[in-house]
């Protein structure tokens, strides 16, 4: 499996499986002298971890992170940072019934075909449990971005099923289990979740991530454009089936006179491009949206096959999220932060002494 790393200057490599002993990651490229503690990382891990509300999987993992290397006396040393989280609440017996059966909509069939073997316990490496280490690495990136550049990366639930949430109050996002910024939608979201639980079904979601105060100039045309790397990173999150930058697919129905972000001496007049022009950050907020499919681990019977190719009807048992989009907010934030930090370090290496007379806002 060769796809376990992301980034060039800020490089994150993760390892571990859903029901293995532990999850871990190695982070290379972190500059020395950054104050960082396990408590700093834990803040974001607690936002992602399971079992924190009745709306998510009841697998109760504490997700306590341990810093194994790269930090001495509370600051980064510039060497590789090693992080680890132990798995403590596995119930592998829940998955014994699917040892020889391929769950429809999951990676069971493709992993078996590719590798000839698979860890069926909770999906193994294909499980979203792996994203805990992304969030841990992203917490370090977010702290560096905030301290050194004033960059703030935040996300929210933009839609779940037919319930759309307007960005009305950033503070509200951290005050409810849905990461919803619209108080008027909390009751409809609760009703939808109760309906799904009763039906044994699941639902999809849309998450929006915004990075503010991003410096001008990030991105490496042509193949490592900032939007291309963001799409790559966000698309790598489990269950993500679509990524939009700025207005995304809405541009299909727009005319050029509507979609272009006009500029005056006071700055940009709009941000349809999502803060990226020609693959390079413009200094405006970087905005991305992701669509997450409804989880296939549901109580509704479905058709599949076993290893012998025989038809099987199955119900997926175990502890699962009725909407994976709820806990995806901190994951999406982490992936955007990882990409931004990587590009900031790349920009500093090549163009750190470039000076332009063109105004910046």
UniProtKB/Swiss-Prot annotation:
GO terms for cellular component: cytosol. InterPro entries: Chorismate_synth, Chorismate_synth_AroC_sf, Chorismate_synthase_CS. Its cofactor is FMNH2. NADP(+) binds at residues 48, 54. Disulfide bonds: none annotated. It comes from the Bacteria. It is an enzyme of class 4 (lyase). Homotetramer. This is Chorismate synthase. It comes from Yersinia pestis. The lineage of its organism: Bacteria, Pseudomonadati, Pseudomonadota, Gammaproteobacteria, Enterobacterales.
